[in-house]
Amino acid sequence: MKPENKLPVLDLISAEMKTVVNTLQPDLPPWPATGAIAEQRQYYTLERRFWNVGAPEMATRAYRVPTKYGQVKTRLFYPQPDSPATLFYLHGGGFILGNLDTHDRIMRLLASYSQCTVIGIDYTLSPEARFPQAIEEIVAACCYFHQQAEDYQINMSRIGFAGDSAGAMLALASALWLRDKQIDCGKVAGVLLWYGLYGLRDSVTRRLLGGVWDGLTQQDLQMYEEAYLSNDADRESPYYCLFNNDLTREVPPCFIAGAEFDPLLDDSCLLYQTLAAHQQPCEFKLYSGMLHAFLHYSRMMKTADEALRDGAQFFTAQL
């Protein structure tokens, strides 16, 4: 689609979203011109520092957990001594960017609002790790904490998965993996999904939206996919194209959040319509005037804070 035919997104977003877009960080270096992933990761981590300031203080612990691929870093947030459940958080970043630091504020707020222990899993990024390694690492971490729950003072009788963007796909894929392979890590009480991608190859929103402001042009999406997948056949895997999985039975309750000007919005809409049509418990909420990745900006935007509160409230209602 010719760029000129796309919607003038930056003219249409909300006032608070425009404030975020226009926020300058004087000490931030320019986006790396080489395109090297290592440099992009470093830039992303630096850029997110500003947005992670001022998060709630709470007991926090860092542990490395074993997987068949080696050890994976995790970060545990304890908002209270007696948590009613444990929520595993998977960060976004197109499978190639992001870490526990870039999403620290999101995890702290989620722990504070839910009063549940939140465990961030620093799964191995792509292209170093290819599908389905990240999912297998997440599942291995869940199993490890389930077996060692007493040692870590966590409640693993009820768990949940949460994630943004690529992390949302990993969250739902991990929940389906546990179901399909009959792995017991505790009851999956809910899944929280903020503006994820779930397997659409094309859509109206992917055509009309996406640009340099969100890194989600069709070319960008293709690049993320090629970095993540092992081969072309993986595109149809039920753990990548989640619409190829069985969404008619035993899907944990899903909170599905969409951003109005997100190219991936149709993925969320289709997921909600599919689950609702088959009487699977789910809730969809559209956040008006928002761009993809708006969850990061709760330091400045009430809507981002609201979206985190909504997800936390949905999860605690399932307990």
UniProtKB/Swiss-Prot annotation:
Molecular function via GO: carboxylic ester hydrolase activity
GO cellular component terms, A-Z: cytoplasm
Active site (UniProt): S165, D262, H292
Broad enzyme group: hydrolase
Chain location of the short sequence motif Involved in the stabilization of the negatively charged intermediate by the formation of the oxyanion hole per the record: 91-93
Record carries keyword Cytoplasm: yes
Family that this chain belongs to: Belongs to the 'GDXG' lipolytic enzyme family.
Protein name per its UniProtKB record: Acetyl esterase
Organism: Escherichia coli O1:K1 / APEC
